[in-house]
A protein has these predicted regions:
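Basic nucleic-acid-binding interfaces
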Residues: 2-99
């Protein structure tokens, strides 16, 4: 099941890393490879790879996609740190929003 196949309650349980311009960035604990983060924007849901900063699943409108990719590029090291913490089920660190 892709991102759209997950139960809405699963998304509520994901730690929030950041929120900006109506977008909510989250990450699951013990999630599957490749390393990635989840984006919610209104009714849209998507998964973006940390390395590629390309969508792995779901959809975002083009402007939102560009903004999330820009944010991801600026905070890639912090995303990797949170991915590592999530693998250890340790508390995740908040990341600054896009300014």
């Amino acid at each position: 099941a892709g991102v759209l196949g997950r139960n809405w309650l699963d998304y509520l349980a994901m730690p929030e890393l950041c929120r900006f311009l109506g977008m909510i960035i989250t990450m699951y604990y013990d999630d599957h490879a490749p390393p990635h983060f989840h984006i919610r924007y209104g009714d849209y849901k998507a998964i973006m790879g940390i390395d590629s900063l390309m969508l792995l699943d779901g959809y975002l409108p083009p402007r939102a996609l560009g903004l999330v990719a820009e944010w991801g590029a600026l905070h890639r090291d912090e995303l990797w740190e949170d991915w590592s913490l999530a693998e250890q089920r340790a508390p995740l660190k908040k990341i600054k929003p896009l300014e």
